């Protein structure tokens, strides 16, 4: 089975990995997704579009869900892409590909017309980075 986009892989993996079935197919899907990582270390949703934080974050989450270690070179390249494309305000800019279907209003999230997809892209990027963060055990404020 060949799955062309990170979006399709993640949708497929959500059910299949958690079911514990089809391990060979999961490995094949992982390899297919890894093969679509670009020279800039990111992923794109559609082959002809630029890499984005949205697609890269989603691809990394899919790969980690499928069993790729966050220490793997592929994952770390994706992390570097995300860190290199993060905006000064902490968000990631993702250009919308959709037609305008509702009146524009400013939510307060940066990037104007592209704020909604950028908010989702920022969420995926943040999730992917959090998976790669070192484990941290919180301590009580009083030190106990």
Locations of the language-model features?
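An alpha-helical repeat/solenoid feature that recognizes helix-turn-helix modules
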Residues: 1-31, 35-138
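Eukaryotic intrinsically disordered, low-complexity regulatory tails and linkers enriched
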Residues: 140-144
């Amino acid at each position: 089975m060949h799955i062309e986009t990170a979006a399709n892989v993640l949708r497929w993996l959500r059910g299949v990995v958690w079911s514990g079935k089809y391990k060979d197919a999961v490995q094949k899907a992982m390899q297919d997704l890894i093969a679509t990582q670009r020279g800039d270390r990111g992923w794109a949703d559609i082959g002809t579009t630029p890499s984005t934080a949205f697609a890269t974050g989603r691809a990394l989450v899919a790969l980690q869900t499928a069993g790729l270690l966050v220490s793997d070179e592929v994952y770390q390249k994706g992390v570097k892409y995300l860190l290199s494309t993060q905006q000064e305000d902490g968000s990631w800019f993702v250009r919308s590909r959709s037609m305008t279907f509702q009146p524009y209003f400013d939510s307060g999230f940066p990037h104007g017309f592209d704020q909604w997809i950028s908010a989702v892209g920022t969420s995926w990027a943040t999730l992917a980075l959090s998976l790669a963060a070192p484990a941290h055990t919180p301590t009580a404020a009083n030190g106990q």
